[in-house]
Amino acid sequence: MWSTTSCRMGLLLALLGLLSACDDKPQQTTARNAVPTDPTLAQLYDSSCKLCHANPASGAPLTGDSQAWSPRVAQGADTLLDHTLNGYNGMPPMGLCMQCSEEQFLGLIGFMAGVHIQ
């Protein structure tokens, strides 16, 4: 039969196991399932940006990766927009979104970077 000490030890281990599963950090949305709240931007993101910015193998900064986006955002909206419109390194001109307006590009960049871009 179980002794009182064994029961307490078992209960303590079970409790510690449950507590170790708790995490006070909010769950981050992964690049693969992130979607803008604006329906138009969501469609544009899905049809053009997502191909590279949700694929770690592409080398593009991943959607929601603030560490990767931070130095880019620090360059300012004009530079980000210029790189988007004209292409930069492996990014094709217009990010393959020929129908996107500059305002939409800024909205998409802001969504991917996790900041408001003006």
What are these regions (language model features)?
Residues P61, H83-H116:
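Axial heme c-ligation environment in periplasmic c-type cytochrome domains
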Residues M1-L11:
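Bacterial N-terminal signal peptides that target proteins for export
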Residues A54-D82:
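Gly/Gly-Pro-rich "capping" loops immediately C-terminal to redox-active cysteine motifs
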Residues D38-D46, I117-Q118:
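Short sequence/structural segments immediately N-terminal
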Residues T29-P36:
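Short Cys/His-rich Zn2+-coordinating modules
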Residues Y45-N55, L108, M112:
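The canonical Cys-X-X-Cys-His
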Residues C22-P26:
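Bacterial signal peptide processing site
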